[in-house]
Amino acid sequence: RVTVRELVKAGKNLQIGTLSDLQGHCEIGDYVRFHSNVHIGQKSKIGNFVWIFPYVVLTNDPHPPSENLLGVTVEDYAAIATMSVILPGATIAEGCLIGAHSTVKGLTEPHCIYVGSPAKNVGSTSKIKLPDGTSAYPWTQHFKRGYPEDITQNW
């Protein structure tokens, strides 16, 4: 079961995992991947080629319960690891990696790694290496599965 509420605007090739919940009034870009048990709060704005892994929650109410909802923004090519919580009004910058079990508030810097609760910037994503020694990020340099060739040839 997946719940997609009213006024969700989604781009091309959105993939939604089992038991995910997309609240209304959200904007979602092209080629976004939501794994299982993801919660996207109202007023969230998610860019293109974003990965959100299991049990991630994008919150939206800074003083619950209230009518003053602040959506989360996730920019292009960001990845949010399992069980992370993104607090109301936060912005995950382009190419950011949010580590598992992290709690993010405020603004992040592009292409940086954030871990912990509260999440802290621990450096550039370029310092993460694959087993062969090449950079794991940006992930578009080595991962193309499930994307059309006309898209990946421009990476």
Positions of PLM-derived features:
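Left-handed beta-helix
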Residues: 1, 5-6, 11-12, 16-18, ...
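Short glycine/proline- and charge-enriched loop/turn segments
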Residues: 54-61, 129-132, 136
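Conserved catalytic-core motifs of eukaryotic protein kinase domains, centered on the activation segment
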Residues: 62-64, 90, 124-126
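Conserved beta-strand-loop-alpha-helix hinge in the C-terminal portion
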Residues: 110-135
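Acidic/histidine-enriched, glycine/proline-rich intrinsically disordered or flexible terminal extensions
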Residues: 132-155
